[in-house]
Amino acid sequence: MEYYIIRDDRIGHTIAEILIRKARAGLEVRVIYDAVGSWRLSRKTLRRMHDAGVETAAFEPVRFPWFTTRVTHRNHRKIVVTDGKVAYLGGINIAKYYLDGDYMGKWRDEHLRVEGDAVA
């Protein structure tokens, strides 16, 4: 799973719990999150996932943003591959405000399901 924004809100916690449950069941679970887009993702949530066997990695952590151009080099992908046969991709991040509507104006991001050879 790869996402620009993963928030520590109701939606983020629900997804984290699903990932934790799957990792504890023996499935291979990997999460890549953007270090800037997901800056509100807590160490506590990351630690809980890690302790359950979820592999997590931050994309391009920024240590000193005023000394680097890496702060604008971000990963905006939103991809989930479930089993090598089904994947989801699109513009929806993992955050409650994607369901609430007017948080940042009126917009509608979409995700789509892909199956078959295109997933592999």
Model-found features: residue ranges?
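HKD-type phospholipase D/PLD-like phosphodiesterase module
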Residues: 2-120
